[in-house]
Amino acid sequence: MGTTDSAPLIRACWLSWLVVETVDQTEVVKALGLMDVRDTTWADGVELIDEVAHNEKKPFSTVVITPPVQGWTLVVGPYFGLPYLSQTTHVTDLCRKLSALFGKAQLFFHSEQNDGEAWLIAERGRILRRWISEYPELALGEPSGVERRLLDAYGITGKPEDLDPDGDLAGEWAATWGDCWATTVAEECSINPTTAVMSEGRPLIADAPPFEQSHRPSRRGRL
């Protein structure tokens, strides 16, 4: 899909986002406990998203909240990155709780560097699926929808987390993830911010609430 000057497509080398099925931006901000909320422009917001993704000192400090997009509200930033082990448990529980409040909540991580994909699908307080390509042992639930179809097309009849990690099929799958990227799943389940036309309303910037971290992330040595 196309875009407009006022609402550019959201891109980042490592893109993490939460999406909640509601048009009430204020309630999402409240439910997340976000602080120091302020208006921004789309251009500045999108630029900030990529800057924060590269921020090694405070990667989890800032998020960008979109206006409603096709019935969903997105909150973007590494704070919601499932592959960052210091975040995984926290954001999983957070997404589950948000789904209990709003009906549906989802998390996604997409790497333009082809070094990882992740998603979490929650509905009505239940985790239906969590997949983190770098940590298959952390998978929850059953593949469904486009994930299931692409696995079947690749000849994987079970779950990818059950594959022999030293086997040929697992290695071939991991080379491209069978084109089953987070953006692919998001396109079917909710909103893919790399292609969706965003609302012309104004996004917000906010500080994310701190939480106790058991250890710093070491994924790819970036943070």
Language-model features, listed with the residues they occupy:
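Long, compositionally biased intrinsically disordered terminal regions
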Residues: 115-116, 123-124, 128-223
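Short, flexible coil/linker segments at or flanking structured domains
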Residues: 3-8, 16, 63, 95, ...
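Short, intrinsically disordered low-complexity segments
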Residues: 37-132
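Short, extreme N-terminal segment that most often corresponds to the first beta-strand
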Residues: 1-37, 219-223
